[in-house]
Structure formats: structure tokens, C-alpha cells
């Protein structure tokens, strides 16, 4: 593997289930098989991860898909062009509300998205303060919350102000009544519910399309200078993805997630059983049938930015920006 342009690689991640393939590739030695020595760096927030990737402290990162078109548009005030060769997860987030708020609004666990939207919007119109948090402005979670509110009132959805919280801080934030609800990926909805703080009232796949949520992101300049290194990284992570899809026993994977403090609650086939199997299903179906980035996903993200922020762009510009988000060298398959 001496032909690799770089052997020491810094990979940033946020503690969520959908960084699992990166962690598993390291644990199983798949990076080492490719001649790579990887340093896994846990970041405090999406903003810090974005900045450290843009300024070269990280070579590669577990990244929000919407960060890429946002950077291309200059919305994040970055001078870096971000690209992805690989999807890490597709749309699989949830909206949770405080349990006492659910009781006050008569929201039951089996409620549908339209009903939960109607009851929250009605509370907002009655000036019953309902503060909602997203993980970052440029994320499917942000768009999911807006589209959820828009099921009832598009104007309110467009003008609604959201708070921002890193995924690992969601449980603490709702427990301390910093906000009343949030949209985030797992395992943070499950943890907040198990600890008695919130209930899940909506699922993102029932609100927005099955677009890429997290991707493996690099700066375009770094990718152009390190094509063989990037190919090796993708090969290792794809091997981990394939392994996770096929494994019948995820006990080692579970232990790894506990070690990384991603799973911080007791959950097994004997305790919180439905949550246990839900997490296993998410791990096995993280990226759907294909982990290849799709032009239509980034086109949808750009359309959302245009819809909610009135960003002007022609159809040709939208296509060009969407294409620029995808690393063009074909990823190696396992």
C-alpha cells in the first residue's frame, strides 16, 4: 500500500448510530488492511466538525448531507468545497416531544404525523410556547421539522424559529426544559424516551423522502490530491457496511457503541426489547440498497434551501451545485 498518498488519516464523527460503519471498519482492521492508520476524533458539534474539516484538521468526516450544498452556496461562510464518495445513512430520524407536553396535547404513542403536527401548531397559535430544536440549520432534521409543521400551516413553518443542539445534548436539553421537542437521529430519541423525558411523535420517513442523511465528506482539494487514499478509505468503510448488513449477531457492534458512549442505556432482548430490535434494524439498514451518492438527493436538499430561505438559483445552477457535491471517481465495491 506504499502508493497511497497519505497513510495517517484523521476522521471526525458525531456520536450517532450512523457513524457505526466508520467505527466498525477501525475495530475490524479494515482500514489497516488498506494501509491506513486512522485516528477517530469525536467532535462536539456539527459546527465544530464542519470547521475542522474545512480548515484541514480533519481529513475526512461523518457529515450531514446538507452541509455540502450549503458550503457550495456559501451559506456556511466556508471557502471549502465539500464532496462525498459514500452515503453513510439515509433519512431515519424522529421527532420527540416532552412527555408532559404530549399529555397536555393528548398525543398518544401511535399518533400519526398529521395529527401531531396539528396539535403542536394549534398550541403555537394559542401562544403556548413550544420550543423545538434541530441538530444544525443545514440538515434533513431542520427540513423535517419545517415540513412537519407545514403539514398544518406552511406560513408558520417558514417563520418558526428553531434552537440548535448537538445530538448528544438533546437528552439533557429536553430533561432541563431548554426546549420542548427535537428532531434527531438515534439513539438519542430512544434514550430520552427510556429516561422518561419524551415520546416519539413523528418519523422522518413519513414526512420527507428517503434522501441521504449522513455522508462521508472530504474537501474537494484533498480528494483531488489523495485519490488512492480516498479509494482505500471508501473500500474499508464499504466492507464494514456490508459486514453490518449481513451480521446476524450484533453483540460486538453493540459493545463497541457502548464503549464509544453512543449507547448509554440498558437495552437488550430482555429489557426495552422493542428499542433493542429497533436499533439493530437501523444498524443493518443504515444506507438502504446502495451507498452511492445520488444527484437527486442533493437536488432535493437544494430545493429545500430554496423553499425555506428563498435562495435564488436556476435549474441549471441547482444541477451544477448538486453535481459538485458528489466525488466523481467511482467508489470501489466490496
PLM features: what roles do these ranges have?
Residues 3-155, 180-187, 197-203, 209-210:
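Short, glycine-/small- and polar/acidic-enriched structural segments
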